[in-house]
Structures are given as structure tokens and as C-alpha cells.
């Protein structure tokens, strides 16, 4: 698989590249960015999706831990509400690629951050076909439990995580039904016609909120959320919550949750 060099101008990419070259250039086979950052479709909702391909001897190293901590500062500056860290595999895993962890289809739309070259060739061998149904049912069970427990997001951090789970369902559904991975953005059009309007409504509302995303953080919240310490960030989210705007709350009405239930029921019948 050939992966082309990232040629955008996002500051987060430049900072990670500089950090890698200055201090950590010996521990990686490659650093890859995927998702909206790679395709130059960044909007305020966008988070940072990056894959580290680590040389095997550094997988448990202090160098790798320091890199993650230092690079997360730049990533959290890009998206203070980022709810996941780096994806990572070892160089040896390329010969038995974990397709269920990060589908190969995602990498086809990715870009290389390091090393610096017009493109690199990465040989990926998938020896074990993943059980795509497992990932799908794991996700819809999480969502179903939220509905059954009458859980609702209390702040923007929780809302983003919740919406991201919902918007991953079309991708997981496609993979489970067709036994192959797909780029998340392409999955919406690929499966939309399978569902009735009332079943698909929850996806449309989640997408609308995504497109209107504009969290209002005060200076203290922003400064606190730049910190990569997970426990500290949890405390910030709990004790200095970022309020959900009324325009978003109005969309998260009974119709939204009823549609989510209908979507889940439809999928359980289909798969």
C-alpha cells in the first residue's frame, strides 16, 4: 500500500513532525494521520486521528511514553475535547495486520507525517479475517444501555463522545453486513437507503450537530483541557463542565432517542 505525504498546513501536524525529528525519530517506522485531518476536511468538530507504527524494540519504552505525552499537548490544543489518544501497532504487526483495530480501508485515505518523503510503501498482510459483527454489536449494546438507563450527555465532552459513537454505527453496520471495512465518511451513503426515515433520523441529527459544532470554552477550561493527564481532564470535565447549547439540547428530544432505538432494532433484525 502506498501512502502519500501530508501536504496540508495544520499547525498540529507541524508540531508533531518537529517533535519527532528533534527527539524521537529513531522509534517509529512511520507516523500516519487519517480521518478528516488527512483528507483536508477539518471542521470545528474534527478530532485528531493518528496511527503510530512503532519499531518493536520501543513498544514498551520510556521514549514512546514521553512522545505520547508531549504530542498529546499539541493534539489537545487542536481539539480540547479529544476523547481518544493515538492508535498504535508495532512494525511486526504489519505482517499480521489487526484489521478489526483499524480497517485497511481507513489507511487508503491516510497521509504520512513521518518519515518525510513523497510517499511510502507499507506492506500489509491480513491473515485473520475479523469478526465485524463483534464491533457492531459492542457499539449498539453500549448505545442501547444508555437509552435503557435514560442516560443523557451533561456537557460538550460527553456529547461529542456520544455523537461520535452514533456516527460510527453506519460504518460498523456496513462492515458487518458486507464483511469488509469502509472509510467512515463513505459509509453514510453506502447504507442510508437501507433504513426508513424514522430510523435514519438520529444519524441526520447527529450530523447536524456535528456541522454546527462550536463549543464555547472559557480561558480556564481551555487551559485545563490542554493537559494530557487523563485523571486531571476527567476532573475538569466534571467540575468545570462545558455547557451544551440550547440549540443542541432542543435536537436531543424524544424523537432523537426514539430514532436511536428504531435504528438499533432494525440492525438487530438485519444482522
For each feature predicted by the language model, list its residue ranges.
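Catalytic metal-binding acidic patch
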Residues: 32-69, 84-88
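Charge-rich, solvent-exposed alpha-helical interaction surfaces
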Residues: 15, 67, 74, 190, ...
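Conserved NTP/Mg2+-binding pocket subregion across the NTase superfamily
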Residues: 1-11, 68-163, 168-169, 190-191, ...
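A generic fold-level signal
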Residues: 26, 43-45, 160
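Charge-biased C-terminal accessory regions appended to nucleic-acid-, cytoskeletal NTPase
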Residues: 212-271
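N-terminal regions immediately upstream of nucleotidyltransferase
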Residues: 1-10, 185, 189-197, 201-202, ...
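Helical scaffold of the NTase/Pol beta-like nucleotidyltransferase catalytic core
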Residues: 1-32
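Extended, well-ordered alpha-helical segments in internal regulatory regions
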Residues: 166-180
